[in-house]
Amino acid sequence: MKKESILKRFLYFLLAFLILCIEQAPTIFVRVKDVRAVSLLILVMLLISAGALFLGKRMGLLEGFKTLSSLKAWGMIGLTYLGIYIVTRIGAMVMMWEGVSNSTNQEIIENAHMNPFLLITFTVIMAPIVEELVFRGLLMGRVFNPDSIVGLILSSLLFGLVHMPNSIGVWIIYAGMGFTLGTVYRKFQKLEYC
């Protein structure tokens, strides 16, 4: 591998890390109750989401909504979520055998007592957009070759790690979700399917 290629891959890795840090920055303020502060925080989260989408589009990692216009696309999305459901059920069974009732990640979210609108913005909009850009788009698509098994495994393990697993069952859930999403990205190279 050439020095230029190694440097470029390292810079993509740093970009992925920076984006994750930017995504996490607003979580410092999730306990705010003032309506104006909540509104501002939601706006910041939406801007981070829009920035991630813009960056993904500019880097050629996203094609846009036209990708979702086919029946095949929706079939793949359905199969992806079926895979996530299966992995989650397996992980939940292992958690039950371990005597673990909740993941650390879930406990943090529940104990934060977030405003419901903040919670929805963070967990339904910002986190999925940013995490797909980082773990599938940048790590699998740019740091590694999208077809790389090493990239698939490493991005899956890192995806599991950032969700703070506290048991084998939780590892199965989050790393399994990362592996499912990564497998779909590896096969079709479309973040929109993830």
Please place each PLM-identified region on the residue numbering.
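Residue-level signature of transmembrane alpha-helical entry/exit and packing/kink sites
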Residues: 5-13, 37-42, 69-77, 115-120, ...
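Alpha-helical transmembrane segments in multi-pass membrane proteins
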Residues: 6-59
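Membrane interface segments of multi-pass transport proteins and intramembrane proteases
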Residues: 31-36, 95-103, 142-149
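Alpha-helical transmembrane segments and their membrane-interface exit regions
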Residues: 45-53, 103, 177-186
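Juxtamembrane helix-loop-helix connectors linking adjacent transmembrane helices
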Residues: 61-127
